[in-house]
Amino acid sequence: MSKNVALVTGGMGGLGTAICKSLAKEGYKVVANCLPDFPPKDEWLATMKAEGFDVYAGEADVTDYEQCGAMVKKIEAEIGQIDVLVNNAGITRDGMFRKMEKANWDAVLSTNLDSVFNVTHYILPAMAERGYGRVINISSVNGVKGQFGQANYSAAKAGILGLTKALAQEVAKKGVTVNAIAPGYIGTDMVMAIKEEVRDAIIATVPAGRLGKPEEIGDLCAYLASDKAGYITGATININGGLHMG
């Protein structure tokens, strides 16, 4: 198939940027979703284009269903049909469950789980109608195993895994695959900015003895987006250096 458009939600963050680069290297026109009037947008686009990547911005608050629809419509009209969707948008609002504010529960579920519905709902039917598509949902090791102090985040990321399996069954005969990636600790700029002793303590829990590289997640996305991965669907691929082997 000829490469068309790949949409990456939360595409201008550390992990999102790596995913965008990996897909662009494979010849996709990559649309990086960001919030409307996102201050770093122009600088991010300029940097990516200077590095030779064919990237665009798709503005929408992914917690807003109507905004997602408008974004998808604009992308399809101005850039092309969306053949690959990577649902990567996510936030954290950590805290003990008994002390967790309802607003922090709602914010994480809305951004991390509802957004997957909001964007995918506008894209998946067209993929199925065309007989081709790739949906890649970014979950987390903590969605697989749970994590102390992250009841909201773990619930949202676990929800992504169930949604992935259900959608995969619905569209498997339509030439569309739906898979999830569950990263462990990845060396994004945000992680690398924490205190060295804290980072070292995290690394000590990982059998591989290191953090994952953002480009390792990006390259896995590129593989799942390819024709080579056409028989993989409904899968959760753990990429965590052996941190969790369930």
Feature roles, as predicted:
Residues 12-13:
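Conserved glycine-rich cofactor-binding loop
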Residues 140:
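Residue(s) in the substrate-gating loop at a strand-loop-helix junction
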Residues 96-97, 101-109, 191, 202:
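Substrate-binding pocket helix/loop in short-chain dehydrogenase/reductase
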Residues 26-43:
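Conserved glycine-rich Rossmann-like NAD(P)H-binding loop of the short-chain dehydrogenase/reductase
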Residues 172, 177, 232-234, 240:
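Short, small/polar-rich loop/turn modules that mediate ligand/substrate recognition or access, typified
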Residues 120, 156, 164:
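Active-site helix of classical SDR
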Residues 125, 169-173, 230:
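Alpha-helical segment proximal to the catalytic Tyr-Lys
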